Amino acid sequence: GITPDGTREVLDYALYPTETAANYEEMMESIKKRGVKQVLLFASDGLAGMRDAVKRQFPEAEHQQCWVHLSRTVARYIRNKDRKEVLGDLKSVYRASYEDEAGKALAEFLSKYGKRYPKLAGIFERVKESLYSFYKFPEAIRKSIYTTNMIERSNKGLKHKSKVKEQFPNEDSLDRFVCCYFVPILSGCNVASVKPPPKYYNCLKKNFKPPINKM
């Protein structure tokens, strides 16, 4: 999550043998029990069932499909010689200034490449409800929320640290290791700020229902 002062905060973590939407839904239930009443936006990769899980637990929340993961999915269906051009054109969609411009850019993208790569249309159709949620938020923070990069940076660091340790004797050992890794993030040490300019706070506050007076 992001605190009012703009720093990242780990709201929860859990150990599971596999990654599923049901696991994440359990974590959503956990943060609700600990007092979280509203969430404005969830961003996730292409894991099946995530949008439905979000809507069951936080019906008012928006769900954003990560555009980086979406681009990687597209790349898998593109021939190497075309990949640079195709992915370059795809950037015009999520870098558009307005949602309607993004929609037009995607239509043009599919018109240009759809016949050559017929599976592209299905990729976007499956996540169409989560493509442009980030446009509902101030422009100053959109680059921070149209991907899952914030949590991916943490995950990458955790993966790197865990490789140094050859094995964990039990689940408690792994749990302690993960917890110790997240402590600096929770304390705000060495964490990049994503704080929007003050003028955008009023816009963000109005997104809550009922609107909040203080952040």
Regions found by a protein language model. Name each.
Residues 92-215:
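Acidic/histidine-rich catalytic cores and adjacent linkers
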Residues 16-20, 42, 66, 78, ...:
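A generic short alpha-helical patch detector that favors 3-5-residue windows
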Residues 1-43, 48, 52, 57-60, ...:
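RNase H-like nuclease fold core
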Residues 38, 62, 142-146:
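A generic hydrophobic-helix recognition signal that picks specific residues
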